[in-house]
UniProtKB/Swiss-Prot annotation:
One of its GO terms (molecular function) is metal ion binding. This is Cytochrome b5. The keyword RNA-binding does not apply. One of its GO terms (cellular component) is endoplasmic reticulum. Membrane bound hemoprotein which function as an electron carrier for several membrane bound oxygenases. It plays a role in fatty-acid desaturation and is also involved in several steps of the sterol biosynthesis pathway, particularly in the 4-demethylation of the 4,4'-dimethyl zymosterol. It is found in: Endoplasmic reticulum membrane; Microsome membrane. The chain crosses the membrane at residues 98-118. It holds the Pfam family Cyt-b5. The gene is CYB5. Residues 2-78 form the Cytochrome b5 heme-binding domain. Belongs to the cytochrome b5 family.
Amino acid sequence: MPKVYSYQEVAEHNGPENFWIIIDDKVYDVSQFKDEHPGGDEIIMDLGGQDATESFVDIGHSDEALRLLKGLYIGDVDKTSERVSVEKVSTSENQSKGSGTLVVILAILMLGVAYYLLNE
């Protein structure tokens, strides 16, 4: 018998290190997956702690994504529990990581251009 979580319990798991979503009344712990999400972590972070069914279906995920999702399943949502609003998680930490990556990419690109110009 799967564990059953209230909407409140799921809503409490919307932080960067402890991150759950609901899809088709099933609860998934995507904490370890969000950084690997092909669409970027910002997309999935906007849905933390809440029902992501509509967004998930609208995107049209692959069979591989559906298989991966099965491995992240931790239980079902109690549909009789009261729905709650979820406070959005700040993605400033993620944005600063992204801008650091951009700096590295630009530095490598500049080195490549300098190397090309010096060896002409």
